[in-house]
Amino acid sequence: MIVRAARLLRRPFPSSISLFSTSSTNSSSHDADANNNPSTNNTTHFGFQDVPTADKSNLVRQVFESVAPQYDVMNDLMSATLHRQWKDDLVDMIAPRPGCKHIDVAGGTGDVAFRICDRIQRRLPPLHSNFQPPPSEVVVFDINPGMLKVGKERAQEYGYNSINEEDENENQSPPPLQLKWCEGDAERLERFSDNSFDSYTIAFGIRNVTNIPRALKEAHRVLRPGGRFLCLEFSRVQNAMLRQAYEAYSFHVIPTIGEVVANDRDSYQYLVESIQKFPTQIEFSNMLEDAGFQHVQHTNFIDGVVAIHSGFKLDK
């Protein structure tokens, strides 16, 4: 039985929590970089806890192993189903087309990948058409086997032709649309060569990565010139009154929903805390530029409850 990491590290709920960093935009981006870089620190944050850097990925893995069976249901409840629209908006920005090659990192349950596959399928020409585009490929990449298991089961339910890494056969003619499932760490995409993908998405996953700058550099490496990086993530609310209400909801309601629905208050307490530790919109944009992305911008939803960050790889 998996020991819940959040319970091991649980501490009393703080009496006063700020959703905003008071440091300046420019300097805070470099502070965020250092705090997520294990080469400069022996410890890192796991929610509000300081833990050995080498331990964080395993602690995060245990959290998502615990929440995997109820992950999508909890997303609906926590966001009042708004996460569905945010993911639709994310995929709209990609505008996937037949023949494209896409990677969705931390996408275990397939929520984003299925949307991308649907868009591609709608644009595929009839099988009897004289023109057939190259095969499309959508890769779901996640560190947690439990999340991938849920995604594969959903893919089978929806009728997708899924391919596991161990099942790939180079001698077989690929179908028009391939949906692949890969287990691995966002910081290490070494199984993929440089310039492999047209687009890269990560939805509600980057804040759980131990070394965010390293993951961003890997994202830049595997994208083709002209490729687009898109990240959907909880962010910093701009309006003071909304921020206060959102703070109360996050720390008092979400863990309670997790306890009632998923029988796991502690994991959702960690997830709420991890949102507060994530860099601001400007800080994260600066991190994208440091990783080599250009034309970096972000779009806030609900005044910054979540944001979609975008950047392009323009060099070779």
Show the residue positions of the predicted features.
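Core SAM-dependent methyltransferase catalytic element
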Residues: 291-295, 300-316
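A short acidic, Gly/Pro-enriched loop at the edge of an enzyme's catalytic core
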Residues: 187-200
